[in-house]
């Protein structure tokens, strides 16, 4: 078992069970919102680790975009190893937890499937990570002496935070819509292939049945009596 490498939050690490981080595995760039799409082979399980501070909010949303049944097993565990969420054969889910200090683990399990691989999308939304409090402290040193202004820096800060929150929510909705669109497109393509296959089967059956019927009708009118000389 190799050594585990942990990066400062909110960088996310990819691992495969047995719980060993893949050598050279790339992490996410620091961001409060991160999304990732990956392919989980049949009979495999993939786990991710997310370091979190105290009293922050961790929201995980996942969807199965492609694969037979569009289902997966999901497991979320606390830094102490306590199971927080365990779902079986689900196509999507949303879970929010108030965090404590430590590394949260969440896994996607496809071991129940022996043939079909799954394409999985998930998104992390991290709130109350401490950056906002630090930003407010940075702004406070510019507030002194601004009472003469028509608009105080507190008002500007409030407007900026409101715009930031709405832009973040808009980006989150767009990401989810792209995931839904990808899953619907995969379902439509699968249905298209299935309809074409069975249409060809029906066509072949119809041709064979028609040929048999023609042969049987023709045989009814044939004179099989032998003429005497």
Curated annotation (Swiss-Prot):
Segments in the Cytoplasmic topological domain: 218-229
Residue intervals on the Lumenal side: 28-196
Subcellular location: Endoplasmic reticulum membrane; Golgi apparatus, cis-Golgi network membrane; Endoplasmic reticulum-Golgi intermediate compartment membrane
UniProt main location, coarse: endoplasmic reticulum
Occurrences of domain GOLD (ranges): 45-126
GO cellular component: cis-Golgi network; endoplasmic reticulum exit site; endoplasmic reticulum membrane; endoplasmic reticulum-Golgi intermediate compartment; endoplasmic reticulum-Golgi intermediate compartment membrane
Record-annotated membrane-spanning stretches: 197-217
Pfam families attached to this UniProt entry: EMP24_GP25L
Xref: SUPFAM superfamilies: Supernatant protein factor (SPF), C-terminal domain
Highest taxon above the source species: Eukaryota
Entry's Gene Ontology BP terms: Golgi ribbon formation; protein transport
Membrane topology annotation: Single-pass type I membrane protein
Keyword ATP-binding: no
PROSITE patterns registered for this protein in UniProt: GOLD
Leader peptide range in chain numbering: 1-27
Family: Belongs to the EMP24/GP25L family.
Assembly behavior: Interacts with TMED9 and TMED10.
UniProt name for this protein: Transmembrane emp24 domain-containing protein 5
